[in-house]
A protein has these predicted regions:
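N-terminal Rossmann-like NAD(P)+-binding domain of SDR-like oxidoreductases, especially those catalyzing
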Residues: 1-149
Length: 151
């Protein structure tokens, strides 16, 4: 099996640039994007022309374990960036955030275990540290997320 990397959240700002950088570095990339009826790949729609067509796109939803398993087949590494952002919406729609950010991550981990994926990198946000107690903030800073999406 050739090294294939699954990038979840590839339709987001960071995920799209990561996908582009991985392709430029010679990696075989499967870009997991959120399905939508417009067939839009989010920020990937705007990637450089010389990159388009050099990565595989999988349209799905990390909340669906069946689709996650299908997306992960033949991959040996996962860069998990898929999540919902926008703090104000998390206050009035917390279940949606839990389903995507928590259960979606669980689906990624379970599929990785099933397919013996050897490497998983999960991204987060500096917002998990809350108001800075000291600067610069390091990874040793106490975790004190201020909202549901930052815990």
């Amino acid at each position: 099996m050739t090294d294939k990397i699954l990038v979840t959240g590839a339709d987001g700002f960071v995920g799209s640039h990561l996908t582009e950088a991985l392709v430029r570095s010679g990696y075989d990339v499967r870009a997991f994007v959120m399905y939508n009826s417009f067939n839009s790949w989010g920020w990937l729609d705007h990637c450089a022309n010389d990159i388009k067509g050099k990565f595989e796109v999988f349209c799905g939803d990390v909340r669906d374990p069946h689709g996650v398993r299908q997306a992960m087949k033949d991959c040996n590494a996962v860069l998990h960036l898929a999540s919902l952002i926008a703090i104000p919406y998390s206050y009035h729609s917390p279940d949606t955030y839990i389903d995507t950010n928590v259960k979606g991550t669980l689906n990624i981990l379970q599929a990785a275990r099933e397919f013996n994926v050897s490497r998983i990198i999960h991204t987060s946000t500096s917002e998990v540290y809350g108001t800075a107690r000291f600067v610069p903030i390091t990874e040793d800073h106490p975790l004190q997320g201020l909202s549901l999406i930052h815990i």
